[in-house]
From Swiss-Prot:
It comes from the Bacteria. Belongs to the universal ribosomal protein uL23 family. This is Large ribosomal subunit protein uL23. One of the early assembly proteins it binds 23S rRNA. One of the proteins that surrounds the polypeptide exit tunnel on the outside of the ribosome. Forms the main docking site for trigger factor binding to the ribosome. HAMAP family: Ribosomal_uL23_B. One of its GO terms (biological process) is translation. Keywords: Ribonucleoprotein, Ribosomal protein, RNA-binding, rRNA-binding. Pfam families: Ribosomal_L23.
Length: 98
């Protein structure tokens, strides 16, 4: 795993009602990640970018919804999310990240 690949693994933090609830209750942070990212890559990327220790990583693949606009049928893209559990005493402050 080279540093260049790790910099491309995380796409964005997920900021939703569910992600905020999980972050507060279980000390987990949700990220959108590239489709071919593995758990070890996600762990290494979070540790490299945010300088924290990761305890565990859970990933899920979400299928894109089929949407209709008038008589045209389209589809939203598929998405892969990662829920990252941090070790005790660790936290990520997105306001401080540059």
């Amino acid at each position: 795993m080279n540093a260049e690949r790790l910099m491309q693994v995380l796409l964005a933090p997920v900021v939703t009602e569910k992600a905020t609830f999980v972050a507060e209750k279980h000390q987990q942070i949700a990220f959108r990640v590239v489709a071919d990212a593995t758990k070890p890559e996600i762990k290494a990327a979070v540790e490299l970018l945010f300088k924290v220790q990761v305890e565990a990583v859970q990933v899920l693949n979400r299928k894109g919804k089929v949407k209709r606009f008038g008589r045209f049928v389209g589809r939203r893209r598929n998405e892969r999310k990662a829920y990252v559990s941090l070790k005790e005493g660790q936290e990520i402050d997105f306001a401080e990240v540059k």
